[in-house]
């Protein structure tokens, strides 16, 4: 077993995105909960995968936090590493990969559709996909629903009022008003405990 060194996580995500004893009450919708021993904010799938791989190697407990919706945290906090997906660099006007939204409209060329669907290994869906939306795990469902509606697309309205992130919604198959994530998802990237990224 290796010894946990916070410097390794700082090398992966940057020193400014690692905090010690961060109050989790600031990151949950109920505004309760003690501090996380370490609070880390990756902004790409690669950074998240590298963090998970390292934490598994040193056998440090970790938890992925999206929007913190309906999450209860004990007053004692969390004696491990919280990997938060809720980071957005507003000062620089940049959006990290985990918060990006890409919409390929229905009038996109067949070549564009094939290229995008091949990226996710689902080229066989080309005949059934009218429009394509790709979004990171940290994207708020309300934001995604609004962006999709702004493009004149339908089918994701059910998620507009769900107070969570896309990553959490996929994990638990969130739904409302007769719609569910399983009804609209074509493919997903998943990071396993060894830090490998898979397409499903």
Where does each model-flagged region fall?
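Anion-binding (especially nucleotide phosphate/pyrophosphate-binding) glycine-rich loop
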Residues: 2-166
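FAD-binding subdomain of flavoenzyme oxidoreductases
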Residues: 154-159, 166-200
């Amino acid at each position: 077993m290796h010894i946990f060194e916070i410097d390794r996580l700082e090398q992966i995500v940057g020193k400014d995105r690692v905090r010690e004893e961060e109050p989790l009450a600031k990151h949950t919708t109920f505004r309760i909960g003690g501090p996380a021993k370490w609070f880390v904010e990756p902004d790409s799938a690669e950074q998240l995968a590298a963090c998970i791989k390292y934490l598994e190697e040193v056998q440090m407990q970790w938890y992925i936090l999206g929007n913190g919706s309906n999450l209860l945290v004990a007053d004692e906090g969390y004696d491990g590493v919280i990997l938060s997906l809720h980071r957005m660099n507003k000062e620089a006007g940049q959006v990290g990969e985990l918060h990006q939204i890409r919409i390929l409209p229905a009038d996109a060329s067949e070549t564009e559709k094939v290229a995008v669907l091949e990226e996710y290994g689902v080229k066989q869906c080309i005949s059934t996909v009218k429009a394509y939306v790709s979004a990171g795990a940290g994207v708020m469902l309300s934001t995604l629903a609004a962006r999709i509606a702004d493009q004149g697309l339908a089918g994701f309205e059910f998620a507009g009022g769900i107070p969570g992130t896309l990553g959490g919604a996929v994990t638990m198959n969130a739904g409302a008003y007769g719609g569910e994530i399983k009804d609209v998802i074509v493919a997903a990237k998943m990071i396993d405990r060894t830090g490998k990224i898979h397409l499903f």
